[in-house]
């Protein structure tokens, strides 16, 4: 049986004709039987694709034949094409939607004016040398931090990346402007842009983790500064490092919104026609229509009606 894998990658580099790049990517992935999501802009490319391992290897080789993508780093993860509903290749103004396409500047070396890149071991060294002065700043949506984050991290109140500029300009984080700030996100791409936005707004000492949380977790498992699970954007929805939740060093952060039981599984509220919330829910509460809700009053009412109908 053929082994399947998921590839995660991004590359900031000028792309003169994003539409032509989109057509090339779509045709190549269809030929190789890969599924996933690829976003392309004039600033670069951001992709997550899954499929047969041999097909993934051929994809990597083809990508590196293109001059602008030769230095692209590909991360391999467990999974395959079955983890994605389809192949989606699109052109956008931004490959990560911060709402500031005109502010981002890139050249052949990547983002201009971003934070200093640190390898995982350099992150630990910075904390050893600077202690509690170091601030970890979560560059993801706040929801993702419910199941995992760096120890004592600052988690901004954001639902989407579009909210970050408003948050940075709110004054809430001005106390961090003279401190060493380590921005972090899943694979590193969001912090490439976020660190640049922060520097443009007066944050003086900004760092980012090479390879993001994924690379740090691969290096240290549950024995470093990371706590809990990692939210991922495929059908798995979360992953763990080391030996997972059974690891003695694993710290459980996620808990069911209804009963408080430990869980890392996000589920849709029962009121899917009106509510788009993903909430942490244990299997028992998800199976019961009465508790399969996000906790908002109207959604509780919808859940109660569903439970009553099921009881008839």
Swiss-Prot record:
GO biological process entries: tRNA modification
Domain named Rhodanese: residues: 130-225
Key word tRNA processing present: yes
InterPro entries: Rhodanese-like_dom, Rhodanese-like_dom_sf, Rhodanese_C, TrhO, TRHO_N
Assigned keywords, A-Z: Oxidoreductase, tRNA processing
Any one Gene Ontology molecular-function term assigned to this protein's record: oxidoreductase activity, acting on paired donors, with incorporation or reduction of molecular oxygen
Pfam families in UniProt: Rhodanese, Rhodanese_C, UPF0176_N
CDD domains to which the protein is assigned, alphabetical: RHOD_YceA (cd01518)
E.C. code: 1.14.-.-
Disulphide-bonded residues: none
The reaction(s) this protein catalyses: uridine(34) in tRNA + AH2 + O2 = 5-hydroxyuridine(34) in tRNA + A + H2O
Record-annotated active site: 185
UniProt function note: Catalyzes oxygen-dependent 5-hydroxyuridine (ho5U) modification at position 34 in tRNAs.
PANTHER family recorded: THIOSULFATE SULFURTRANSFERASE/RHODANESE-LIKE DOMAIN-CONTAINING PROTEIN 2 (PTHR43268), THIOSULFATE SULFURTRANSFERASE_RHODANESE-LIKE DOMAIN-CONTAINING PROTEIN 2 (PTHR43268:SF6)
Family: Belongs to the TrhO family.
Designated name of the protein: tRNA uridine(34) hydroxylase
Organism whose genome encodes this protein: Corynebacterium diphtheriae (strain ATCC 700971 / NCTC 13129 / Biotype gravis)
């Amino acid at each position: 049986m053929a082994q399947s894998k998921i590839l995660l990658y991004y590359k900031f580099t000028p792309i003169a004709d994003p539409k032509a790049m989109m057509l090339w990517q779509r045709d190549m992935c269809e030929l190789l039987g890969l599924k996933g999501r690829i976003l392309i802009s004039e600033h670069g490319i951001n992709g997550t694709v899954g499929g047969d391992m041999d097909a993934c290897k051929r994809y990597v080789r083809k990508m590196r034949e293109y001059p602008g993508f030769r230095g692209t780093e590909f991360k391999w993860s467990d999974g395959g094409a079955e983890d994605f509903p389809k192949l989606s290749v699109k052109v956008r103004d931004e490959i990560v939607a911060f709402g500031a396409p005109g502010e981002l500047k890139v050249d052949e070396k990547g983002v201009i004016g971003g934070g200093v890149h640190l390898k995982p071991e350099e992150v630990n060294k910075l904390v050893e040398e600077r202690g509690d002065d170091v601030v970890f700043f979560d560059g993801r949506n706040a929801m993702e931090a419910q199941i995992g984050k760096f120890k004592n991290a600052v988690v901004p109140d954001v639902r989407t990346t579009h909210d970050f500029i408003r948050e940075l300009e709110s004054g809430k984080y001005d106390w961090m402007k003279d401190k060493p700030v380590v921005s972090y996100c899943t694979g590193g791409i969001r912090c490439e842009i976020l660190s640049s936005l922060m520097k443009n707004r007066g944050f003086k000492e900004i760092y980012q983790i090479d390879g993001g949380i994924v690379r740090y977790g691969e290096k240290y498992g549950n024995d470093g500064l990371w706590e809990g699970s990692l939210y991922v954007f495929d059908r798995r929805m979360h992953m763990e490092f080391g030996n997972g939740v059974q690891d003695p060093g694993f710290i459980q952060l996620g808990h069911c919104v209804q009963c408080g039981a430990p869980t890392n599984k996000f589920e849709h509220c029962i009121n899917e026609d009106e509510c788009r919330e993903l909430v942490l829910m244990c299997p028992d509460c998800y199976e019961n229509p009465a508790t399969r809700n996000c906790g908002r009053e109207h959604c509780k009412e919808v859940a109660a009606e569903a439970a009553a109908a099921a009881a008839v």
